[in-house]
């Protein structure tokens, strides 16, 4: 990753020193649940990278809560209940979902904010039938494939302190939004919103962007050559596992041989995921407050922290 003057850069070893004796609340059993497909996340990496990050986020949450109390007191109104919102962005196959799950687990262990909800933007994709009638399913994951109005309304409701908000649910097995199913968000202390394009700016002047609602943005970065390799490895693993389920949208790929599956996954990367990364996702990295830079082994090797 190129050096960016607006960030302070810490090696993994330097960042680990910022843990400040924070105890590690997770076990290897917890990691088995949190770890993503083909990822080698270890307790050591959680302790050296994610635990210090959770400490930083905890300090940010406390400061934001105090600032809101001061503002509400100044305005002479009751102290409102609004969650601290964290956005996590990054490419397909980079491990942002695992990052989100680990941070959710760690942040929920801090006593001041035990209720941490994780919401993915997959649920805000237009249903397949709508996408097929518009740009086509090959554009799924590109900015135009999301119902941004609905996503912004969800975030506005969070901001307003709405007591219960229903969020659409996406199924990776059926490759579609699940009709009639919802995740209910009930005034949590923290909301983590994870998705490819969550750090994008507004499409036009004066428009509201999803990232306008974030208290802090995180971008998970890796070199494209590594991302391509990880994507192909993940596809091959899914072909031998989840794709074998007859109800899976991708069941037809389960019978592919190794060479055919590799070629197919590479084609998907080169024609869909790669261009989306280059055109839409990577340009949003500069909007992040924290960049987690991964090496070829999927481990975070540096943390880029925006200067105040």
Swiss-Prot record:
Pathway: Cofactor biosynthesis; coenzyme A biosynthesis; CoA from (R)-pantothenate: step 1/5. The keyword Nucleotide-binding applies. It catalyses: (R)-pantothenate + ATP = (R)-4'-phosphopantothenate + ADP + H(+). GO terms for biological process: coenzyme A biosynthetic process. One of its GO terms (cellular component) is cytoplasm. Its main location: cytoplasm. It is an enzyme of class 2 (transferase). Signal peptide: none annotated. Pfam families: PRK. It is found in: Cytoplasm. It comes from the Bacteria. Keywords: ATP-binding, Coenzyme A biosynthesis, Cytoplasm, Kinase, Nucleotide-binding, Transferase. The keyword Magnesium does not apply. ATP binds at residues 90-97. Belongs to the prokaryotic pantothenate kinase family. NCBIfam families: panK_bact. This is Pantothenate kinase. It comes from Sorangium cellulosum (strain So ce56) (Polyangium cellulosum (strain So ce56)).
């Amino acid at each position: 990753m190129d050096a960016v003057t607006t960030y302070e850069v810490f090696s993994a070893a330097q960042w680990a020193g910022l843990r400040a004796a924070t105890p590690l609340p997770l076990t290897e059993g917890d990691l088995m649940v949190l770890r993503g497909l083909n990822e080698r996340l270890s307790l050591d990496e959680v302790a050296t990278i994610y635990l210090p990050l959770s400490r930083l986020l905890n300090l940010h949450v406390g400061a934001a809560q105090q600032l809101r109390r001061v503002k509400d007191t100044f305005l002479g109104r009751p102290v409102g209940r609004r969650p601290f919102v964290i956005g996590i962005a990054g490419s397909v196959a980079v491990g942002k979902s695992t990052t989100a799950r680990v941070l959710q687990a760690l942040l929920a262990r801090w006593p001041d904010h035990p209720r941490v909800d994780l919401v993915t933007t997959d649920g805000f994709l237009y249903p397949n039938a709508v996408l097929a009638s518009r740009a086509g399913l090959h554009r799924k994951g590109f900015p135009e494939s999301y119902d941004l109005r609905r996503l912004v309304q969800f975030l506005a409701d969070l901001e307003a302190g709405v007591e219960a908000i229903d969020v659409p649910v996406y199924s990776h097995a059926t490759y579609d939004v699940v009709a009639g199913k919802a995740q209910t968000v009930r005034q949590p202390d923290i909301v983590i919103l994870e998705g490819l394009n969550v750090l994008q700016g507004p499409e036009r002047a004066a428009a509201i962007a999803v990232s306008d609602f974030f208290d802090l943005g995180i971008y998970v970065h890796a070199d494209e050559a590594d991302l391509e390799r990880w994507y192909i490895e993940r596809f091959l693993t899914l072909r031998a596992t989840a794709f074998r389920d007859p109800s899976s949208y991708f069941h037809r790929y389960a019978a592919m041989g190794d060479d055919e599956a590799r070629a197919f996954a590479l084609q998907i990367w080169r024609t869909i995921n790669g261009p989306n990364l280059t055109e839409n996702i990577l340009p949003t990295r500069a909007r992040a407050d924290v960049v987690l830079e991964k090496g070829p082994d999927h481990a975070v090797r540096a943390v880029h922290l925006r200067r105040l």
